[in-house]
Regions:
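Short helices/loops that flank or line small-molecule/ion binding pockets
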Residues: 169-176
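Conserved small/polar residues in nucleotide/adenosyl-binding loops
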Residues: 177-182
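Short loop->beta-strand "edge-of-pocket" segments that line small-molecule binding or catalytic clefts
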Residues: 130-148, 156-165
């Protein structure tokens, strides 16, 4: 194991670095649509795997974009990643896509980071705080498949709705904007 970076720092750097790489390949405009999404999935997966091979060679690895290696089940430490959550959103130039990186030790999540690269943000388990913003008081729902009942529920609760793409973007939306104040206990 490389002692150059703590697990927390490595988790955060992987989420940030993956996001920067993905923004870079999208920004040059050589690929579009499905080809861009597939290239993004592949490149992000390969880069994360290589970084973990170098810095945490004895750890297990589980990724949405790679074949499962059952050997991870024998490991005390397992990295769980979704290198590009929201491939369709990424490929079409939307901002609601994410990079997920987590370390689980002996079955317990110990470090996690969710990068929202187009928003210039990495949410880290090492840095929890209350945030408010333009989506406060809104229910996050699927941009692609919003439930028919969502508007009714939002109206009954006196809330609005916010259609969001990737699961990571929805999760961060919930963490950031469901609590109107720190005293509500969600992010205190």
């Amino acid at each position: 194991m490389s002692a150059q970076y703590s697990d927390s720092r490595l988790t955060n750097l992987i989420a940030q670095g993956t996001g920067e790489i993905l923004k870079g390949i999208r920004g040059v405009g050589l690929l579009r649509g499905r080809e861009l999404g597939e290239a993004g999935d592949d490149l992000a997966q390969n880069w994360i795997a290589r970084v973990l091979e170098q810095h945490r060679p004895g750890d297990g690895f589980l990724s949405e974009e790679a074949a499962d290696d059952p050997a991870r089940l024998e490991k005390n430490r397992v990295w769980i990643v979704d290198p590009l959550d929201g491939t369709k959103e990424f490929a079409t130039g939307r901002q609601d896509w994410a990079v997920h990186v987590a370390l689980v030790e002996d079955g317990v999540p110990t470090h996690a980071a969710v990068g929202l690269p187009d928003l210039g943000t990495v949410f880290k388990s090492s840095d929890v705080r209350h945030v408010s913003g333009p989506f406060a008081g809104k229910i996050a729902l699927s941009r692609n498949r919003p439930p028919a009942v969502a508007s009714y529920v939002a109206d009954q609760l006196g809330l609005g709705t916010a259609p969001v793409g990737s699961a990571g973007a929805k999760a961060m939306h919930c963490l950031l904007y469901t609590s109107p104040s720190p005293r509500d206990g969600l992010l205190s």
